[in-house]
């Protein structure tokens, strides 16, 4: 049974400060995502149309997905891929003093912290030698995910770092070179099917290991703002090697063949795959044309494809911030993390369940799926915090799932003061908790207030109740609008759902 998580009512705090800080935090997230997407080749995304294959029509009503980031970064419980790339500070500051540029190059201080980057690409890739998970049990993960109400799973088969979680015949940095060729994907696929979950593969066409002799490992925004700095090699030293045009062309052809070959393996070795989640495109002349969506659908006719490789796909993706305030007309997904990180990072606190459920219900009110990110440890385990938070979400879903599963945004003739969904003759209003200063953790929760909810453009309700326990709520109705009283005494730290029957 869902623990009440009841608040103690308190006086109102300044809403303006909260809103201002929330906007500032979202603005910072947007800037980071924009810079990273530019570096990996994610451009404008469209989903004007989507596949009509009957096997793909599960997607818009799926609601809740689990995004699992796993790779060699788990060896040191650090963020994935991006820590090897210095120069974010240089993306914000133009260095015009030649002496200061020389100092930065000499000391490797590309993040302007008075010290070199904590890890070089070569040091990062060395973690592959120590990546050999002995407690990998995806069935345990996904049994808990299913009980929590998740409908589909997406696992990183290969991130930008370049390490593939299966023994690939293409490229030279995967489990065939390490772990005696152990395949980490097949147990995951089997566990998805066993637990009735849709199978999703994340795949990054950018492969920094494959590109290590050619790539500038300076953060793209930093290199763009400060073009006087040299390109950096895999030791984060000024790159000294050069390549002929023929060598570059041969590398680019091999790169395209590697990406095409690995995607083909993912779509032919593991049976039916429900979703393919790309993240960028190869830095080659052919780029997104290394494999077409038509070729992908010949291998997997019912697959759902995101637009981050080809620029168009079956659904648009919003990352870190929900990029719309209006109901979407096509398919869409919002992905964010349960902690501050995509993979497992030691001692990273989990965002409050009320925050996560607030983002989930806001997404569903707009017709958007919510893809929530977690990561296993180096041994292949979920930490207790994941299971504990899944249990809270699962209990909430048992009582309130009808408000988010199979529901749609409100009809265009209706509006509400809070996020809301519609299903037949019922409407569901979501009263989410508030957080101070744009925060998202338990310590940021603000005390509950009495709240007035409004729903306009409807006929006279036949019943209004708190969905979790069926208790009646006071309301008034006039001129097609209902005003509902939700007292602080009935609020919880989670999202409180009000059911309006018409």
Which residues are covered by each model-predicted region?
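Mature catalytic domains of secreted/periplasmic carbohydrate-active enzymes
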Residues: 25-502
């Amino acid at each position: 049974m869902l623990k009440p998580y009841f608040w103690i009512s308190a006086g109102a705090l300044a809403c303006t400060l909260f809103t201002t800080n929330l906007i500032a935090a979202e603005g910072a997230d947007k800037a980071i995502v924009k810079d990273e997407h530019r570096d990996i080749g994610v451009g404008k995304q469209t989903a004007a149309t989507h596949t009509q294959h009957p096997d793909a029509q599960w997607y818009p009503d799926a609601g809740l997905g689990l995004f699992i980031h796993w790779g060699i970064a788990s060896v040191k419980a650090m963020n994935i891929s991006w820590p090897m790339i210095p120069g974010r500070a240089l993306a914000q500051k133009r260095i015009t003093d030649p002496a200061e540029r020389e100092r930065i190059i000499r000391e490797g201080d590309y993040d302007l912290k008075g010290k070199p980057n904590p890890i070089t690409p070569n040091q990062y890739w060395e973690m592959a030698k120590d990546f050999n998970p002995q407690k990998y049990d995806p069935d345990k993960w996904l049994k808990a995910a299913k009980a929590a109400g998740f409908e589909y799973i997406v696992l990183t088969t290969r991130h930008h770092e370049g390490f593939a979680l299966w023994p690939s015949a293409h490229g030279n940095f995967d489990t065939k070179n390490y772990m005696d060729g152990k395949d980490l994907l097949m147990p995951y696929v089997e566990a998805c099917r066993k637990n009735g979950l849709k199978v999703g593969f994340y795949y990054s066409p950018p492969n920094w290991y494959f590109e290590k002799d050619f790539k500038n490992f300076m953060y793209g925004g930093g290199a763009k703002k400060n073009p006087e700095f040299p390109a950096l090699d895999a030791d984060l030293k000024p790159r000294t090697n050069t390549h002929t045009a023929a060598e570059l062309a041969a590398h680019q052809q091999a790169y395209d063949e590697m990406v095409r070959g690995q995607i083909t393996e993912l779509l032919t070795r593991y049976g039916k795959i429900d979703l393919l989640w790309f993240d960028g495109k190869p830095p080659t002349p052919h780029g997104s044309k290394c494999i077409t969506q038509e070729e992908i659908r010949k291998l997997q006719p019912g697959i759902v494809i995101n637009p981050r490789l080809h620029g168009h796909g079956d659904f648009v993706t919003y990352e870190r911030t929900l990029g719309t305030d209006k109901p979407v007309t096509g398919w869409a997904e919002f992905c964010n993390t349960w902690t501050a990180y995509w993979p497992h990072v030691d001692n990273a606190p989990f965002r409050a369940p009320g925050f996560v459920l607030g983002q989930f219900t806001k997404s569903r009110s707009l017709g958007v799926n919510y893809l929530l990110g977690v990561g296993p440890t180096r041994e292949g385990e979920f930490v207790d915090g994941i299971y504990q938070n899944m249990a809270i979400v699962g209990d909430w879903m048992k009582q309130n799932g009808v408000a988010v599963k199979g529901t749609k945004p409100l009809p265009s003739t209706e509006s509400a003061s809070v996020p809301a969904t519609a299903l037949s003759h019922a409407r569901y209003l979501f009263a989410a908790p508030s957080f101070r200063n744009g925060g998202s953790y338990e310590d940021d929760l603000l005390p509950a207030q009495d709240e007035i909810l409004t729903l306009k453009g409807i006929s006279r309700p036949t019943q209004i109740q708190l969905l979790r326990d069926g208790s009646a709520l006071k309301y008034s109705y006039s001129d097609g609008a209902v005003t509902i009283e939700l007292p602080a005494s009935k609020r919880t730290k989670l999202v409180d759902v009000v059911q309006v029957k018409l």
